[in-house]
Each structure stands twice: as C-alpha cells, then as structure tokens.
C-alpha cells in the first residue's frame, strides 16, 4: 500500500550548497579521533555527513484500498514519522547525527482513470499536527 521514493536534496538546499565550500559534492567530512586505551595509540577516522539543516523532497504514495481506513492509516503513518523524529537514521545517532524532521505536508487524491487531483487538506493537517 505504501510506495516510498528515494529522497533527493531539494532545489533550495542545492542552491545553498553552490554558495558554500563543502568537502564533497553536497556534504562535509568530519575528522574524529579515538585513543586505544590499552596502547595509547591514536585511531583517526573520518565521517562523511550531510550538513545540518539540509532539506530533502519526500514522495510517498499511499494506495487507497479501503476508504474507511484512510484516516486511521494516516494517523498510524503520522505516528511513525513522529517516532522517526525521536530516533535517528544511520550511524552515530548518540552524537546527534541522523536526526530528521518532517514538515509542510501536502496530500492529494489522484484519480487514476481521469488524472483529476484533489487536495486533502484535512489529512495534511493530521500529519502536520503529529510531527514534532
């Protein structure tokens, strides 16, 4: 029922990257160092990461199979987004990496036969209110 598309950096964030000096195409490399306790030997490492505040466009397709379950399904999905915001993606979450947030939901119904589009603002409000 749910189709998750790849997330791509949106145009606004892409223009921001064009104006700043980054280590990679659209990221930065953070150098860290740990010390081996037994030997006192330094163990340098580098982590490539997306800079804080980078925004992505997100497309999720929900195939309506039962109209009566639509609101309940959106509430469950909103709860999942909320839980994801309380956790992290990828590694090093205890250091604050991988934190995400969701905003500016736009939900519409698309009739597959006619192509007609109808905004579903009440469902977008459910999502906006559920996230942090």
Please give the residue ranges for each predicted region.
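Small/polar/charged residue-enriched interaction surfaces, especially the RNA/DNA-contacting tracks
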Residues: 1-132
């Amino acid at each position: 029922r749910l189709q998750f598309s790849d997330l791509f950096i949106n145009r606004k964030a892409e223009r921001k990257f064009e104006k700043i000096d980054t280590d990679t195409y659209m990221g930065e490399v953070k150098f860290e160092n740990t010390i081996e306790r037994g030997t006192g030997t330094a163990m340098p490492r580098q982590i490539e990461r997306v800079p804080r505040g980078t925004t992505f466009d997100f497309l999720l397709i929900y195939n309506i199979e039962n109209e009566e379950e639509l609101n309940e399904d959106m509430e469950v999905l909103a709860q999942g987004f909320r839980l994801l915001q309380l956790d992290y993606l990828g590694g090093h979450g205890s250091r604050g990496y991988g934190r995400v947030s969701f905003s500016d939901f736009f939900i519409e119904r698309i009739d597959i036969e006619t192509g007609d589009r109808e905004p579903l603002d009440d469902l977008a409000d459910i999502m906006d209110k559920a996230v942090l």
